[in-house]
């Protein structure tokens, strides 16, 4: 897998204005997420208001779901709502494996077909920056499938600095333990095994409050 390739995705942006305060999304990156396969893909919005456009099936909802996965608690995730899809049409597992079609097995039952098997990892990463505070915050999630397991596991990270997939999430070998060990040496980088403490950490870092209302509003807006 050549994860060093870094492929830009297009998003129309407007010029920044003084009204754009607080932490703004600067860059969003994905690796092995849905049909964004085998290399790093990124959106560089640089804190501006942006409009994501593309043909049907080009991956717009896949990217939106990736950003939602970084910010919304697992129990509240409703993938592909931005495209008006039915519940359970997509899942964390389907994005991890890159399911893109289905085919019938020998018994006539439809089975999903994916771009990837079990021996890989997926990464979601978002960089935020506050011009007023001159501070950066990065959120990341790493997904992998342990041997002999069917459920995807996740590592959650909050860092008070700009991170990138190419610089911080590649070249650590074939064990997630190697990545965890490397990231422990990164200043201002916290690791979590579950979503609740991760959410508490990034809400504090981004100034979102502790009641979860800002994230609930974000999730409702995405679903409209």
Identify what each model region corresponds to:
Residues 1-192, 207, 211-213:
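Extreme N-terminal "head/tail" segments of very large remodeling/mechanoenzyme assemblies
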Residues 208-224:
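Extended heptad-repeat soluble alpha-helical coiled-coil rod/stalk domains used for dimerization
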Residues 199:
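Conserved P-loop NTPase mechanochemical-coupling segment
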């Amino acid at each position: 897998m050549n994860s060093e390739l870094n492929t830009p995705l297009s998003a129309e942006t407007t010029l920044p204005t003084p009204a754009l305060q607080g932490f703004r999304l600067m860059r969003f990156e994905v690796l092995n997420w849905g049909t964004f396969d085998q290399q790093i893909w990124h959106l560089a919005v640089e804190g501006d208001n942006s409009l994501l456009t593309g043909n049907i099936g080009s991956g717009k909802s896949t990217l939106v779901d990736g950003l939602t996965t970084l910010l919304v608690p697992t129990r509240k995730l409703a993938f592909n709502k931005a495209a008006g899809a039915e519940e359970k049409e997509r899942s964390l597992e389907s994005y991890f494996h890159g399911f893109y079609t289905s085919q019938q097995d020998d018994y006539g039952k439809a089975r999903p077909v994916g771009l990837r098997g079990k021996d890989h990892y997926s990464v979601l990463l978002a960089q935020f920056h506050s011009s007023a505070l001159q501070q950066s915050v990065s959120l990341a999630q790493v997904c992998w499938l342990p041997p002999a397991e069917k459920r995807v596991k996740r590592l959650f990270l909050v860092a008070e600095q700009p991170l990138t997939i190419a610089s911080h999430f590649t070249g650590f070998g074939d064990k997630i333990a190697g990545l965890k060990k490397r990231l422990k040496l990164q200043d201002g980088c916290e690791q979590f095994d579950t979503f609740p403490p991760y959410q508490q950490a990034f809400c504090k870092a981004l100034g979102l409050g502790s009641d979860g209302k800002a994230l609930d509003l974000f999730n409702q807006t995405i679903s409209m």
